Amino acid sequence: MPIRIAAPHPRVRTLAGALTCVALLTTPAHAVPITVQDATGKPLPTVMVSRQPVQAAAVDTSDNGYPASAKPQQAYVELARFTDAQGQADIPAAEHPWKIRLRKPGYQDQSLLAADLGSKPIVMAAESDPAALAEQQPANAWSSTIDFANAALKKEFMLQCNFCHQQGGAMLRRERSADDWDSAIKRMVRYGARLSTEGQKTIPALLEAHWKKIHANPALVPAGTPWNPALAQATIRELPIGDSMSQMHDLLLHTNGMVYVGDNLQDRVYEVDPATGKYTVYKIPPRPGDQLGGLLAGRLRDFPKHETYQGIHSLAESPKDGHIFITPSYQRRLIEFDPQTKAFRYHEMDSGFYPHTLRFDAKDRVWFTLALSNQVGMYDRAANKFTLYDLPFRSLMERITVKLTPFIFKLLGWGIPVANYVKVDHVSTGVPLPYGIDVTPDGKAWIARLHTDEIASVDPDSGKVTMIKTPFSAPRRLRSDRDGNLWIVAFNASQIARYTPSTGQFLRLDLPVVPKGSDTPYSLNVDRARHQVWVNGTNSDSVYRYDIATQAWSMFPMQRRVTFTRDVEISPKGQVYVTSASFPSWHIEDAQPTLIEITPR
């Protein structure tokens, strides 16, 4: 039986959808003109002007530090615009006490209360201190300096040690001893990273020496990607949700106009109205017999605070009735959420391990990856039936390891750090890791298998699985465009790629990141209406846009440093949504995860 939670009156889908479409058009009538100059009186373009509340909105924290389930909350929406060639930007006034923060690489940050703005230009002072200039750069600029004298080991490090958080961010570039790095890597391996045994042994001393050198010579940190003057047309809105113990992993823009965000560490779904900043939290109740930490109870043993029974990962909307399906990675089930009644329903599986990313097909079937059992799953809602498709193994040893995975995690749950005792090779034998998934217009399900450098298709009629080797490493998540082509992120290659099924050809595209090759794109999505690809700049505090027709790139910097994003959603009007999803969230500049909305123009 579904579990129901008392809820506000259901919204009318079409009305709410219309509200989202005008989210960025609905601002207070009074806009404050901002003019920014340098010390010589010259206009300063591409200054990020952020409107921030003087104090965060008061929200309910009665449920272990979070809002009570089904109790509406009101957050303060933050907003950022960029100055034009004349150094000017208009900032809509807020209805609460607010301030602005000015940020531009090469200049000192400034903050002013709204009451102190006046009519005179604001002067930004140039920054000359090498250490301060280095601190302004995003994580990718810092991580680009890492040199192990072994390019393959560096790529492996960026693949395995960038899974959950940035490399080169403020927390990960501090000077530490080799022993401290060794302890951190052991903890990371218990969380599930597959850094090779060789890397686990050699990298701690290399990191100790490297960051000691960089902190002694901060001028070695290069500049990040330049901010383009076209940013003057963009608006970025940001809504704080959750806290430093949250992880806002994936999100879904629903046809009812709401954005749904899953807190992976606290088993809560946030239902957000992006037009107003109002949101409601719905806590997923554990089933009888569920244990804290689920089937991976030992994984979060060292984490200070979590309520993870499910481990919310991916969300997708049914094309039939608008219900939301969720992958709970720490269980053998799918979770169904009715946005109108607010009821949760559980669909149990008797096999498979770690349900990961999911998508619907046109027949209202749910396709999903099972990351640790090397399978693709399909749930037929009409028949109430699961079908699992086995993917091939690379070796007998891998087959044995995958079959033993549930037992290995049981040992971890008993406090035995078996992951730290197992020998790991450079290609992660034993954990092939089927990851992202999408369905092309012809009905085929396509997956990316991260550790084997492959994509695969599943024919729903015949059940045939076809494996295809990629000419790049670490295909992570993928999406289909309107023509049935697949767009894939190459995580540690700092690229995206297009695969054309009709020809079997790959087209590889470098991200426009500076320094070249320094980003780790986690995911992407395709705006089919505008024929554009939006890409997570996961290690660079940015989101990229690639226009397929013109082959032009754009880059949109985020307001907070250490904005680690994992997913992209696109509205019918072209707004783009991401979440700041670092694990842990206290790595974020102010330790505050957010829902972010980008309007390009």
Question: What does each model-found stretch correspond to?
Answer:
Residues 273-277, 338-342, 380-384, 459-463, ...:
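Short loop/turn segments that connect beta-strands within beta-propeller blades
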Residues 55-92:
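Short, acidic Ser/Thr/Gly-rich low-complexity loop/linker segments typical of extracellular
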Residues 244-255, 288-319, 351-363, 395-441, ...:
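Beta-rich, blade/repeat-based domains predominating
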Residues 157-168, 203:
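The canonical Cys-X-X-Cys-His
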Residues 259-265, 308-310, 318, 324-330, ...:
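Conserved beta-strand positions in repeat-built beta-propeller and related beta-rich domains
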Residues 565-601:
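Blade-level signature of beta-propeller repeat domains, shared across WD40, Kelch, NHL, RCC1
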Residues 32-45, 64:
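Structural motif
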